[in-house]
């Protein structure tokens, strides 16, 4: 079935259905893909019927049911022999879907000459898919940009247009000398992007501000017009709101006419840098560009030219010192400072040497102090011991007895501690031996696992080499495949169909052979059953004659009757077992068939659609109540 599904999917792709590459069987078909495949086939078979059907599954449940019923009616009109309804499209099962798609694929128009000449490679399929996509996009009606839904936006490839919303920008202006007055407004003036928080309005605001600057540049010779244009967007105007736009339009046209000359005059190619220099020459002539620090320094410390001239005039010329005397005094002062620096450096070196020597002496003294403290502690301990001994000398006998008692108690205490140690030592030693044994077992297990890991590494290396070899073979086969002709002719499909027919013929022969063997076995069973019945009848008659005269023969007759009954039960049990096994196989086939129909998934889809339909009905009822 997989081979037949692949051939059927290939036919659907040729009909224009966008089947994903990962879909290889009909079991993986979704509801959307089933609807698209059926609509594409109907459009190819009967364009009049298929053109009125959408290949996209609508989101509303009522629209889905109407589309499914329309598809079912169209297929029935084509002569589909089986029963067909909306459930075959919304909740498809694999056998019914295969029958329907085979019915539609058989009715697809075929042209032998066209199929023979047309290539069937991946590139040709890709080009046909592109053509079908372009045809679908051209078949869609044009919708104005403001009325397009997001889905139509994706299909028609256009973006939503935004309205022109601008805001007033406050930027540093030019003074009479052409310098930006940033030092006056820098603490309070925000950058242009921060003045317009909306991202969509930044470009519009900058364009409007630049247009105002352009008008100011054009009307620089007319102060009245300049002020009017400058404050047009800042103050409320009482005139017609279209008047500023018309005036701006006329000014731009006049500026372009003056810049580029009359229409009949030859146009002169100008560089962009020259145009910018020409536009800003009037404002920036003779004024060097400085940083904010230089501007603030000029504003803070530089005096006006008139004040500076007055101060310079008040200073007498005779009070200025000669330049040579000033240089000599500076050199003498520099020499004296150098001498002072040298003496200070010498003093610093001497102090550093003294500090090093004192540090070494300090370390030595600290070491001697520690040693003396240790010796004093030892002497104090010896002194305490001797003082205790001297205190015990007046009552020597009693103290000696007490000392012996203390020694004996110490010995008893040592014995008691030794016994306690033995009590603790024995379980600890046993635990140690147990842990040692566990450690040895773990070491053995670790060594065994290490050997297994080494063997695994070797097998991994062998597998890597095998994979590398297979990769080389794969590359070689791919290169050979690339050298083969790309176009797949009808001969390959014919050869494959003949192979399938041959396999079917072999299966039919095997089935016929199995049936004949079954018939022979049935005949043999019947003959053996008849022979068994006749044998039992003859034996029963012979034994029954002698059973009246002899007790042993009577017992044999009873055993014969019991054997016959048991054999009959055994044969009946075997027949019942065969019947049950046959029924089990039939039930397994039915289970596989039901599993192929995807009953559980279809039930889940039906429940989801039922909930969606109830929500739609509730929404419609709410709208009706509102109306």
From Swiss-Prot:
<dbReference type="GO" id="GO:0005813">
    <property type="term" value="C:centrosome"/>
</dbReference>
<keyword id="KW-0833">Ubl conjugation pathway</keyword>
<feature type="region of interest" description="Sufficient for interaction with COMMD1">
    <location>
        <begin position="1"/>
        <end position="321"/>
    </location>
</feature>
<dbReference type="InterPro" id="IPR048348">
    <property type="entry name" value="CCDC22_CC"/>
</dbReference>
<keyword id="KW-0597">Phosphoprotein</keyword>
<dbReference type="GO" id="GO:0043123">
    <property type="term" value="P:positive regulation of canonical NF-kappaB signal transduction"/>
</dbReference>
<dbReference type="GO" id="GO:0043124">
    <property type="term" value="P:negative regulation of canonical NF-kappaB signal transduction"/>
</dbReference>
<dbReference type="InterPro" id="IPR048349">
    <property type="entry name" value="CCDC22_N"/>
</dbReference>
<dbReference type="GO" id="GO:2000060">
    <property type="term" value="P:positive regulation of ubiquitin-dependent protein catabolic process"/>
</dbReference>
<keyword id="KW-0963">Cytoplasm</keyword>
<feature type="coiled-coil region">
    <location>
        <begin position="321"/>
        <end position="384"/>
    </location>
</feature>
<comment type="function">
    <text>Component of the commander complex that is essential for endosomal recycling of transmembrane cargos; the Commander complex is composed of composed of the CCC subcomplex and the retriever subcomplex. Component of the CCC complex, which is involved in the regulation of endosomal recycling of surface proteins, including integrins, signaling receptor and channels. Involved in regulation of NF-kappa-B signaling.</text>
</comment>
<keyword id="KW-0813">Transport</keyword>
<feature type="modified residue" description="Phosphoserine">
    <location>
        <position position="410"/>
    </location>
</feature>
<dbReference type="Pfam" id="PF05667">
    <property type="entry name" value="CCDC22_CC"/>
</dbReference>
<keyword id="KW-0175">Coiled coil</keyword>
<protein>
    <recommendedName>
        <fullName>Coiled-coil domain-containing protein 22</fullName>
    </recommendedName>
</protein>
<dbReference type="GO" id="GO:0006893">
    <property type="term" value="P:Golgi to plasma membrane transport"/>
</dbReference>
<dbReference type="GO" id="GO:0015031">
    <property type="term" value="P:protein transport"/>
</dbReference>
<comment type="subunit">
    <text>Component of the commander complex consisting of the CCC subcomplex and the retriever subcomplex. Component of the CCC (COMMD/CCDC22/CCDC93) subcomplex consisting of COMMD1, COMMD2, COMMD3, COMMD4, COMMD5, COMMD6, COMMD7, COMMD8, COMMD9, COMMD10, CCDC22 and CCDC93. Forms a coiled-coil heterodimer with CCDC22; this heterodimer interacts with the guanine nucleotide exchange factor DENND10; the interaction is direct. Interacts with CUL1, CUL2, CUL3, SKP1, BTRC. Interacts with SNX17 and SNX31. Interacts with CPNE1 and CPNE4.</text>
</comment>
<dbReference type="GO" id="GO:0097602">
    <property type="term" value="F:cullin family protein binding"/>
</dbReference>
<keyword id="KW-0653">Protein transport</keyword>
<feature type="coiled-coil region">
    <location>
        <begin position="448"/>
        <end position="535"/>
    </location>
</feature>
<dbReference type="InterPro" id="IPR008530">
    <property type="entry name" value="CCDC22"/>
</dbReference>
<dbReference type="Pfam" id="PF21674">
    <property type="entry name" value="CCDC22_N"/>
</dbReference>
<dbReference type="GO" id="GO:0006878">
    <property type="term" value="P:intracellular copper ion homeostasis"/>
</dbReference>
<comment type="similarity">
    <text>Belongs to the CCDC22 family.</text>
</comment>
<feature type="region of interest" description="Sufficicient and required for interaction with CCDC93">
    <location>
        <begin position="1"/>
        <end position="447"/>
    </location>
</feature>
<dbReference type="GO" id="GO:0005768">
    <property type="term" value="C:endosome"/>
</dbReference>
<keyword id="KW-0206">Cytoskeleton</keyword>
<dbReference type="GO" id="GO:0032456">
    <property type="term" value="P:endocytic recycling"/>
</dbReference>
<keyword id="KW-0967">Endosome</keyword>
């Amino acid at each position: 079935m997989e081979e037949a599904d692949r051939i059927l999917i290939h036919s659907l792709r040729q009909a224009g259905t966008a089947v994903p590459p990962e879909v290889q069987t009909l079991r993986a078909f979704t509801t959307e893909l089933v609807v698209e495949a059926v609509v594409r086939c109907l459009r190819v078979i009967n364009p009049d019927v298929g053109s009125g059907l959408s290949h996209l599954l609508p989101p509303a449940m009522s629209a889905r049911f109407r589309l499914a019923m329309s598809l079912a009616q169209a297929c029935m009109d084509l002569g589909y022999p089986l029963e067909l309804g909306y459930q075959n499209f919304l909740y498809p099962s694999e056998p019914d879907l295969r029958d329907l798609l085979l019915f539609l694929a058989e009715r697809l128009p075929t042209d032998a000459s066209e199929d023979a000449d047309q290539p069937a490679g991946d590139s040709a399929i890709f080009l046909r898919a592109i053509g079908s996509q372009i045809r679908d996009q051209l078949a869609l009606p044009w919708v104005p940009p403001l009325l397009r839904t997001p889905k139509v936006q994706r299909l028609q490839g256009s973006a939503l247009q935004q309205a022109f919303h601008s805001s007033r920008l406050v930027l540093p202006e030019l003074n009479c000398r052409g310098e930006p007055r940033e030092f006056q407004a820098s603490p309070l003036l925000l950058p242009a992007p921060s003045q317009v928080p909306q991202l969509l309005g930044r470009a519009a605001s900058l364009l409007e501000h630049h247009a105002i600057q352009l008008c100011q540049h054009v009307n620089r010779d007319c102060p009245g017009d300049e002020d009017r244009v400058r404050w047009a967007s800042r103050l409320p105007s009482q005139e017609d709101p279209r008047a500023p736009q018309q005036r701006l339009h006329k000014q731009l046209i006049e500026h372009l006419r003056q810049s580029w000359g009359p229409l009949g005059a030859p146009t002169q190619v100008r560089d962009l840098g020259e145009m910018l220099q020409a536009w800003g020459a009037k404002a920036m002539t003779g004024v060097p560009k400085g940083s904010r620090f230089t501007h603030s320094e000029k504003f803070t410390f530089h005096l006006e030219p008139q004040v500076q001239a007055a101060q310079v005039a008040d200073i007498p010329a005779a009070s200025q010192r000669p330049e040579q005397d000033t240089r000599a005094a500076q050199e003498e002062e520099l020499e004296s400072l150098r001498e002072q620096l040298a003496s200070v450096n010498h003093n610093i070196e001497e102090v550093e040497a003294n500090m090093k020597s004192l540090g070494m002496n300090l370390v030595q003294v600290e070491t001697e102090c520690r040693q003396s403290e240790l010796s004093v502690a030892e002497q104090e301990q010896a002194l305490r011991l001797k003082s205790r001994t001297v205190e015990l000398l007046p009552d020597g006998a009693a103290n000696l007895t007490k000392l012996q008692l203390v020694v004996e108690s110490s010995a008893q205490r040592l014995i008691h501690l030794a016994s306690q140690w033995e009590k603790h030592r024995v379980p600890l030693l046993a635990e140690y031996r147990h842990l040692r044994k566990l450690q040895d077992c773990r070491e053995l297990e670790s060594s065994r696992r290490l050997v297994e890991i080494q063997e695994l590494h070797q097998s991994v290396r062998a597998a890597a080499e095998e994979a590398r070899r297979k990769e080389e073979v794969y590359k070689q086969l791919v290169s050979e495949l690339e050298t083969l002709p790309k176009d797949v002719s009808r001969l390959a499909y014919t050869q494959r169909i003949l192979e399938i027919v041959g396999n079917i013929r072999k299966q039919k022969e095997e089935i016929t052979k199995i049936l004949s063997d079954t018939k022979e076995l049935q005949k043999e069973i019947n003959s053996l059953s008849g022979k068994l019945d006749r044998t039992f009848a003859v034996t029963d008659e012979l034994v029954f004659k002698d059973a009246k005269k002899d007790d042993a023969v009577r017992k044999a007759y009873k055993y014969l009757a019991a054997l016959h009954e048991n054999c009959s039960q055994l044969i009946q049990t075997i027949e019942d077992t065969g019947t049950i096994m046959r029924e089990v196989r039939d039930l397994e086939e039915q289970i596989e068939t039901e599993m192929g129909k995807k009953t559980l998934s279809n039930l889940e889809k039906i429940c989801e659609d039922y909930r969606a339909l109830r929500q739609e009905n509730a929404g419609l009822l709410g709208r009706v109540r509102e109306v």
